[in-house]
Each structure stands twice: as structure tokens, then as C-alpha cells.
């Protein structure tokens, strides 16, 4: 069996409200998370909502990292989807924790593109 991608979904509760509404801080957190997991950054795009909330994505050569925040609830939803053997999506978690300071994190692991090795054409 071969796995084409690793996908973790993060549910972050009890985050610092100011961090969840800090667009430049979220951009930096995304860049730091990309470096931590060993991925290759293509670009980062974020959007600040009114009256509050930020959404953002780091586009990677290996896929993406995304975030959507609800400061009024102290909540953020994140996806870290990577392809390739050299990228470690779980290594993003300490960078995310350092910035958002969640009280609780739920992590869901999804194996993407499970195929039989003999199905892979060289």
C-alpha cells in the first residue's frame, strides 16, 4: 500500500481572541508552520473579516495549510494537507500552539490516496 498524502484536521478551542483576529500574526504563524513541517511555500493569502475573524491559506508545493477563525468563540479550524515523504504535518502543531495558545486541540488524521503499490506506474 502507498499513501499519496497526509491530512490532519485541527479543531482549536479556547484560543486567545486577539491572536484569532490578528491577520499579520496569522500570516507569520502559517509561514512558521510551513518551515516547521519541511514544506515548500509558494504563497500565503489571508483575509480579515469585519467585525472580526481571519481566513488564510499557505499554498505549498506539497499542498496547503488553511485556517478559519472565530474570535468571538475562541475557535479556529485548520487543515494541514501534505504530499511527499519529506513533509511532516504534525510538526506544524507546536508553531500553531505557540501563536494561538489553545486550551484544547482535537487532531484528526486522514490518509489520502491509499493505493496498491502495483497500481503505481513508474
Swiss-Prot record:
Q: Name one Pfam family in it.
A: AdoMet_dc
Q: Which reaction does it catalyse?
A: S-adenosyl-L-methionine + H(+) = S-adenosyl 3-(methylsulfanyl)propylamine + CO2
Its needed co-factors are:
pyruvate
Q: Which UniProt keywords apply?
A: Autocatalytic cleavage, Decarboxylase, Lyase, Polyamine biosynthesis, Pyruvate, S-adenosyl-L-methionine, Schiff base, Spermidine biosynthesis, Zymogen
The record's section on SUPFAM superfamilies has: S-adenosylmethionine decarboxylase (SSF56276)
Q: Note whether Lyase occurs among the keywords.
A: yes
EC annotation? 4.1.1.50
Endpoints of the signal sequence: none
Q: Hey, where's the site called Cleavage (non-hydrolytic) on this chain?
A: 62-63
What are the catalytic residues?
Answer: 63, 68, 83
Q: According to its UniProt record, in which pathway does this protein act?
A: Amine and polyamine biosynthesis; S-adenosylmethioninamine biosynthesis; S-adenosylmethioninamine from S-adenosyl-L-methionine: step 1/1
> How many cofactor units bind, and how?
Binds 1 pyruvoyl group covalently per subunit.
Please provide, in alphabetical order, the Gene Ontology terms of the cellular component aspect for this entry: cytosol
Q: Which cysteines are joined by disulfide bonds?
A: none
The protein's job, in short, is: Catalyzes the decarboxylation of S-adenosylmethionine to S-adenosylmethioninamine (dcAdoMet), the propylamine donor required for the synthesis of the polyamines spermine and spermidine from the diamine putrescine.
| Family statement | Belongs to the prokaryotic AdoMetDC family. Type 1 subfamily.
Name of protein = S-adenosylmethionine decarboxylase proenzyme
Gene encoding the protein: speH
Amino acid at each position: 500500500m502507498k499513501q499519496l498524502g497526509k491530512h490532519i484536521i485541527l479543531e482549536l478551542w479556547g484560543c486567545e481572541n486577539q491572536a484569532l483576529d490578528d491577520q499579520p500574526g496569522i500570516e507569520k504563524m502559517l509561514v512558521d508552520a510551513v518551515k516547521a513541517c519541511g514544506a515548500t511555500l509558494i504563497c500565503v493569502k489571508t483575509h480579515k473579516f469585519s467585525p472580526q475573524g481571519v481566513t488564510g491559506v499557505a499554498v505549498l508545493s506539497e499542498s496547503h495549510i488553511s485556517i478559519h477563525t472565530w474570535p468571538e468563540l475562541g475557535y479556529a479550524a485548520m487543515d494541514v494537507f501534505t504530499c511527499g515523504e519529506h513533509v511532516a504535518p504534525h510538526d506544524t502543531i507546536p508553531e500553531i500552539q505557540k501563536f494561538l495558545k489553545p486550551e484544547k486541540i482535537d487532531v484528526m488524521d486522514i490518509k489520502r490516496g491509499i493505493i496498491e503499490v502495483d497500481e503505481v506506474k513508474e
